[in-house]
Curated annotation (Swiss-Prot):
This protein's name: Protein-lysine methyltransferase METTL21E
Lineage, opening ranks: Eukaryota, Metazoa, Chordata, Craniata, Vertebrata
InterPro entries for the chain: Methyltransf_16, SAM-dependent_MTases_sf
Function: Protein-lysine methyltransferase.
Keyword S-adenosyl-L-methionine applies: yes
Organism: Bos taurus
Binding site for S-adenosyl-L-methionine: W96, G124, A125, G126, D145, W176, A197
Length: 290
């Protein structure tokens, strides 16, 4: 019975990823595009770009060819095969599409966002996939999450970065808004990047999340944040966020209802980080061009 349940869980995950790829690969007929007005044609082309890139992102995922006692999923990023243990009964121990989008962005934009020797912290690291990719790209990484998730997080990070990463990643507890001055004193923190994937959803700690962003940011810190929009509550968080930070939409994935943002503290923008163009999703040999 246990073996059957494991098989059912893994087959469900396979089907889920296959469906995402299938949906991401749907295009309008060329004749239909020809009959559209120019503005609609532009939207159609952008929709096609979005679906093409989403399909490429989802193709980075694979599942085991055999049933294992512990469910895991595989990913190809930063030139490595990454294996992630999940716990499907916990939000923080499942790989969500937002994490895949952020991993793909980091990998395909290494010139604009070079992580080598940079100090990077991920909040709400969950399974650790984003932190693993950042580490494999050369960053000093601190992966953080709630205490009950740290065991699985540490296991995944150690398993996938040992002997592979330039710098050994750290795993630390971070409950948003709790003991920030004690655990992350402002005088000693100096993060170049804050990474966050799908940390905004219908939970009661959005104000604490905002406080945490503000506490961890220096005037030159860059936040790379991927967000899936689900409810009006999330839109209100974005409004609150923009009171403290200059927020720039880098890219949008309508087929996933996901947006990728870059942010820095308001009125403190350094000349080192000029305004960038929208990240246009154009796959060229598996890469994206700005």
């Amino acid at each position: 019975m246990i073996l059957f349940n494991l098989l059912e869980t893994q087959l469900t995950r396979v089907h889920s990823f296959q469906e995402m790829i299938k949906k991401a690969s749907v295009y309008r007929h060329p004749l239909a595009n020809h009959l559209m007005d120019p503005e609609v044609q532009k939207e159609s082309r952008e929709d096609g770009d979005d679906r093409t890139v989403v399909a490429e992102i989802m193709r980075r995922c694979f599942v085991p060819a055999f049933v294992t006692t512990i469910p895991w999923e595989g990913f190809h990023f930063a030139g490595h095969e990454i294996r992630i243990n999940e716990a499907t009964d916990c939000y923080g121990a499942v790989v969500w599409p937002s994490a895949l989008v952020l991993c793909y962005f980091l990998e395909t934009n290494v010139k604009q966002y070079n992580l080598v020797d940079k100090n990077v912290i991920e909040i709400g690291a969950g399974t650790g996939l984003v932190s693993i990719v950042a580490s494999l790209l050369g960053a000093h990484v601190t992966a953080t999450d709630l205490p009950e998730l740290l065991g699985n997080l540490q296991y995944n990070i150690s398993r996938n970065t040992k002997t592979k990463a330039k710098h050994l990643p750290q795993v630390k507890e971070l409950s948003w808004g709790v003991a920030l001055d004690k655990n992350f004193p402002r005088a000693s923190i100096n993060f170049d990047y804050i990474l966050a994937a799908d940390v905004v959803y219908a939970h009661p700690f959005l104000e604490e999340l905002l406080v945490t962003f503000d506490h961890l940011c220096k005037e030159t810190t860059v936040i790379l944040w991927v967000m899936k929009f689900r409810l009006e509550k999330e839109n209100k968080f974005v409004d609150r966020f923009e009171q403290l930070f200059d927020l720039e939409e880098i890219s949008s994935f309508p087929s996933l209802n996901i947006k990728l943002y870059k942010a820095m503290k308001k009125n403190q923008k350094s000349a080192c980080y000029p305004q960038r163009r929208m990240w246009k999703a154009k796959p060229i040999s598996g890469r994206l061009l700005l």
